[in-house]
Every structure is written in structure tokens, then in C-alpha cells.
Amino acid sequence: MIRSSRWFRKLLPALLLAVLAVGAGRSAPAGAAARHAIVISIDGLMPASYTEPEAHGLKIPTLCQLVAEGAWSPGVRGVMPAVTYPSHTSMVTGVSPARHGIISNAVFDPEGKRDGEWWWYTAEIRVPTLWMLAHDRGLRTALIAWPVTMGAQADALTPEFWRGRGIDGPQLLRALSTPGLWDAVGRRFPGFDAAFSTLPPKDEAFADIAVDVVERERPNLLLLHLSAVDHWQHQNGPWSPEALAAIETADAQVARVMEAARHAGIWPDTLFLVVSDHGFARQEKVVRPSVLLRERGLITLDAQNRVASWQAQAITFGGGAYIYLHDPKDESTAARVRELFSPLAAQPASGIARMLSHDEIAGLGGDPQAFLALEAADGFGLTAGVTGEAIAPAPNPGIHGFPPDRPTMNASLVVTGPGVRPGRIEGARLVDIGPTVARWLGITMKDVEGKPLEAVGAPNPSARPQ
């Protein structure tokens, strides 16, 4: 025992130096360690949900309270295209998809070899994210079902990920999450992981994780993504009974996370945001751009109707599509593609409202590698597939993915916290959310397109009641 004590006394200085060295790499900015930010994204939530809930028969007391007491936007301008993964990445980077690199939900897969792979991995993001900057400054971070967080460095992580098109069950996400996280949540909420055997996983289960993490770890930054509203609006349409029920369920989960912040004692120091990534529209028919390309001889199929070769190919995202050239310098193919799609925009029955040039895509912050983009006409959507009819009945009524200048694609924003000036926010953009949160946490996002919202002023923790 004495010899052990002498050994420990000799080792103690080295241990202290090691601890100090580790701490030096993650030093929190002065005054920021006591601050917290919680961002809850309700995927596909339309601003009319909280600006006129009575018109839709919605009972959302929590969102209504936040609107009454905080600041809110009648419509946040999104990104090109208005889909989940580019939008969420623009929120946390402050830049457009052209710069952060997450240019759609699914990875462009012209020959169908990647089984519907999405942009899952944090390593694919080309610029710093809000959670990277926070972690590097010594702040505690939690990421729960936030898109593009596979492999993210965070203190608590459950990424959004699935294999193929079926139900994975809880084992996969448990294995991909921070070790011990799901065990801790299971002790607080026994059986919560059963919700991951449904499609989509229930929002309540992700909120269970958030509640446990907030109360147990008190993170400085928590990002939570709830996806059921988006799912049911796709399946049954905007404002359908199923979609309305999902909005009300999401409202209840927001209330749970707020209560957890109060219980943890961090609410007076918390900037609290409820956001969405895009709006929604309805479709009755779908157009398959790749079928049109195949009919023009620009895509060749093998005996199994798989793509054997292609000169031009589309990736679709509901309200829009990108068209890529196999050889970007192939002027002959470029001319044939323009000749195919340009006249269709003048034909209402074609289902295509607009063809966007490469320069127009760049002006909207879209993929710089795309040759051109298509925008669906009202009542139409653009969908994948190289076989079948070029125009067909829509398999489901709800879509998004249009360019961001279409008002129905506007996203949502409600914010409360110390220094927040209550009332209406005009001119908000998704790229403003990250810089707004960063300023509150005392960190800097350099060389970004967004700017902190004026409604969220200088931090003043004493401004919020307990």
C-alpha cells in the first residue's frame, strides 16, 4: 500500500500534465460553458402549422406558446434543392449545398450500383459544422438522428442511418451510437428501442434519447431531428389526418425536451429553436426524366433493364431534378439534352415548369457539377426510373424538393431564449441558423453565407424567467 502510494505520487505530475494537455485542445470560450443551445428540427413542418393552426384544426400548445413568447418566421428561405440532407447541412454550416457538398439526399448513382445510398457520412461535408466547432472549443455536443452525422465526433451520438429500403430494427442504430448511450436511455425509458422496429421510427423514441441526454449530460449543443411529419405528409399528403396527428405528436416531444432543460437547470441559459428543413406540395402525376433520356438514346439498358451505359442521366428529388452529363465537355450531348427539355417547359401537360441552366443552379447555391436542373409543374413530381411510362400517376400525394424560390418550400423557425426579441422575423434563411446559434455559444463560423438573426440579440441570461 505504501509502495503504491509512492508510485502514485511519482506519477501524479505526469498525469496532471497529460490532463492539462488534453484540456488545452478543447478550451471553452470565456462565458460560453454555461450557455446551451437546443435545436429541434421537425422535418417538413410548414410555417402555416404555427401561423394559422386553427385553420387546420391543429392542437399544438407548445409551438403556440413559443410563437406567443418568442420570435418566429412566416417562412424561412431554404436551399437548392429543398430536401432534407442539403437543408440540414446548410443549417449547421451556414453555407449552401454548392459549398458544403451535400447536394441531395441520395448519392448520384447512374448505374444503380449503390442500393439507394444516401449522404450519410460527416466526412463528406466539406466545411466545418456547428458541432465540430463547438466540440473543438470544449463544448459538450449531442446529435440525435441529425442527418449526415455518421462518424461525427460528439459526446452523445445516435446518427440517422438505414440499410436498403426495409426496417433495420434497433440493433443497427444501437451499434452506431455512442457506447452506453442506449443502455442509459433504456434504464430511464424501458423498452424505448421497440419504436425502431417500425417505419418510420417513432419520434417519441428519439425524444426519449434527447430527454435523457439533456438531463444527464447537459450538453451545450443538442441537435434533434424528428421525421414522422415528413413521412406522413409524403404518404398521405399535406394536412392529411395522419400528418396533423404527427405534427401534434412532434409538438408534445418539443414540450418534453423543454421540460428536460428546466429539470436539468439549464433552461435560463438556453437558446431554444424549433426549425424545419422545407415545406410541402401535392402531386397527382410523376414524370421520369431518365425515361425521356432513354427514349432519346442517351441511356442504354442491358437485357435485365439495368443501365449499361449513359451519356446523360438524372437524379430526382420530388419537385426537381439534376441532369448530369457523363462527359461534361460533350457539346453534342449537351445540345441534345437542351433540345429535349427546353420545349417541355412551355407545355403545361409535360409536367415540367422550368429548366434551369448551370448558371441559374449556381445562383441558387445548387450542385456545380449538374449540367442543368428541372422544376416540376404544379401537381407534378419528378421521380427516378429508366423504365415505364414517362408520365404516370403519382404513387403518393406529398412532395418537396423544388427550388427554394417557390414559396411552398419555405421552412419553419420559432426561437426563444435570453436576448430574443419577440415577434415576427422577416427574411430568415436556413443558412442563418448556424451563425445564430454559434454567436450564442460564443464561437465563430468563418467565411459563411448566413448571418446571425437580428431577433436573437446579445446573450443576456437574466432576461429569461426560470
Where are these regions (language model features)?
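A long, amphipathic alpha-helix that forms part
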Residues: 49-50, 200-224, 229-272, 336-344, ...
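Active-site-proximal N-terminal segment of extracellular/periplasmic enzymes that hydrolyze or transfer
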Residues: 28-71
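Active-site neighborhoods of enzymes that stabilize oxyanions during catalysis
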Residues: 110, 126-127, 308-436, 440
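Bacterial N-terminal signal peptides
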Residues: 11-23
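Acidic/histidine-rich catalytic neighborhood
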Residues: 260, 264-270, 276-326
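N-terminal secretory signal peptides that target proteins for export/translocation
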Residues: 1-8
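Short, solvent-exposed turn/loop segments enriched in Gly/Ser/Thr/Pro and often Arg
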Residues: 72-95, 144-154, 227, 449-454
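His/Asp/Glu-rich, glycine-adjacent segments
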Residues: 96-237, 336
